[in-house]
């Protein structure tokens, strides 16, 4: 099925609308033709009209089967500069908080084919991380705090709100045209995919630091004999963790992305070289773990030059400690020819920083065009669950929280991006390795493929179903 999307809106919001349409409809099997000229709309039975309240199409009797989305002047004014969104300006549809609701009740009453909120403006707000430009608060690492966001205030951080908006749109399309939008298959021939990754933030720690780590985490230590034996064993051989994790993944037939820092202490050169040799030429992926201050200090170019000898196929990156601001991050990684970023997560909780479960591009509000770097937002990080700065859960709660979040996320389709640090396994080593294997096995039993960020980048790069006509 082909769906025409007619844009009858001012040029001041046209680039934002095209960007949003391309990203929110890319996960579907249907073809979409986007145009600002009526004569290019060949399919009059399946047409979405995005227009102003004054548009002549809105009152044309020949457009009875069209679905209308209204762009209001107040929305154009909102996006003309950076400011917080007014949370009094909400409507709820099936308990879903919809921003940019239509305020003209007369139009709503007179047209049953009208979406009661502006899904284009609402989706643009989340996908572009628009709110982060107006948030002045920063934590000690210079990051936007989750508590300052609309996701926190509306309690929707664990809900992909853009997916919910698209579900509402899909219901309207089904009622109007008697058809359902179908999602594309992800790699693995399912509607969901798990992107698994590990950060190597340090190769090893001293015995003194290891003991301190254990003492500081006594709150979460599972006191049993097998964990005690593991703790004693890893007192002298903590680097065995890498092999243990690799063995589990190889046994289960899953693959992961390994994010390597730009450099490690010279004494670990042989170990790092052996790791690279293990993963190169396999279905695993090596990617770049930019240092924590690389974005803030504008050092990406220098760091990229330093890793060229590691693996010529490196195409993605993630920032250490998720320390960045949106525009500076994507400007620098685009300038240095990375293909994807895997940093977009608020570390305080699991969830959806951009409100969407599919990989997408980020809009640059300064240059008014999308960045060329694909965002594969991160959804789960082990540190979020076990670090005392964040949720600080005991292991039995960690597993339950993870499984509940994963189960809910798979209902939406798309990509679930999971980061497990190797250091996670330094505490409760035996039981955490077993937990890790149980979680991976559970995902496999659901028919979900577990693989790399690079595989998702390749999938998205080939997903071309939006045609723009002038």
Language model regions located:
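Terminal accessory/targeting
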Residues: 1-270, 354, 358, 365-470
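Conserved hydrophobic/aromatic pocket- or pore-lining residues that grip, position, or stack substrates
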Residues: 199, 289, 333
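Short, well-ordered alpha-helix to beta-strand connector turns
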Residues: 45-46, 283, 338
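Catalytic domains of cell-wall/extracellular-matrix polysaccharide-remodeling enzymes
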Residues: 17, 25, 294-372, 418, ...
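Metal-dependent polysaccharide deacetylase catalytic core of the NodB/CE4 family, i.e.
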Residues: 202-206, 219-229, 242-328, 344, ...
């Amino acid at each position: 099925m082909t769906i025409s999307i007619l844009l009858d809106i001012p040029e001041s919001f046209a680039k934002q609308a095209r960007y949003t349409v391309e990203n929110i409809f890319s996960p579907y099997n249907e073809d979409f033709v986007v145009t600002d000229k009526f004569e290019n709309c060949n399919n009059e039975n399946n047409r979405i009209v995005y227009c102003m309240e004054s548009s002549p199409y809105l009152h044309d009797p020949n457009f009875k089967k069209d679905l209308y989305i209204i762009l209001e002047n107040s929305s154009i004014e909102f996006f003309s500069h950076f400011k917080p969104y007014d949370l009094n300006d909400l409507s709820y549809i099936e308990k879903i908080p919809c921003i940019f609701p239509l305020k003209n009740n007369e139009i709503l009453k007179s047209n049953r084919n009208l979406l009661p909120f502006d899904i284009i403006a609402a989706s643009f707000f989340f996908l572009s991380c628009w709110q982060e430009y107006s948030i002045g608060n920063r934590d000690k690492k210079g990051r936007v705090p989750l508590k300052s966001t609309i996701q926190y205030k509306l309690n929707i951080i664990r809900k992909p709100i853009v997916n919910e908006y698209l579900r509402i749109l899909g219901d309207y399309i089904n009622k109007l045209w008697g058809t359902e939008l179908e999602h594309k298959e992800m790699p693995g021939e399912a509607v969901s995919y798990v992107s698994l990754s590990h950060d190597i933030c340090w190769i090893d720690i001293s015995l003194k630091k290891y003991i301190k780590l254990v003492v500081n985490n006594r709150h979460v230590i599972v006191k049993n004999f097998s964990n005690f034996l593991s703790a004693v064993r890893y007192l002298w051989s903590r680097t065995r963790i890498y092999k243990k994790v690799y063995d589990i993944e190889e046994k289960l037939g899953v693959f992961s992305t390994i994010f390597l820092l730009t450099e490690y202490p010279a004494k670990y050169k042989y170990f790092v070289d052996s790791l690279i040799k293990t993963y190169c030429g396999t279905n695993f992926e090596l990617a770049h773990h930019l240092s924590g201050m690389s974005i803030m200090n504008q050092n990406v170019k220098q760091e990229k030059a330093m890793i060229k000898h590691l693996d010529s196929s490196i195409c993605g990156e993630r920032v250490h400690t998720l320390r960045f601001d949106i525009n500076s991050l994507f400007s620098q990684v685009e300038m240095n020819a990375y293909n994807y970023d895997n940093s977009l997560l608020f570390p305080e909780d699991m969830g959806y920083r951009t409100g969407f479960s599919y990989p997408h591009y980020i809009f640059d509000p300064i240059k008014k065009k999308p960045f060329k770097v694909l965002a594969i937002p991160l959804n789960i990080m082990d540190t979020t669950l076990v670090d005392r700065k964040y949720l600080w859960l005991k292991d039995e709660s960690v597993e339950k929280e993870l499984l509940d979040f994963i189960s809910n996320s798979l209902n939406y389709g798309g990509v679930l991006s999971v980061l497990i640090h190797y250091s996670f396994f330094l505490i409760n080593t035996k039981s955490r390795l077993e937990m890790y294997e149980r979680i991976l096995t559970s995902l496999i039993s659901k028919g979900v493929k577990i693989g790399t960020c690079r595989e998702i980048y390749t999938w998205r790069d080939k997903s071309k179903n939006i045609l723009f006509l002038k």
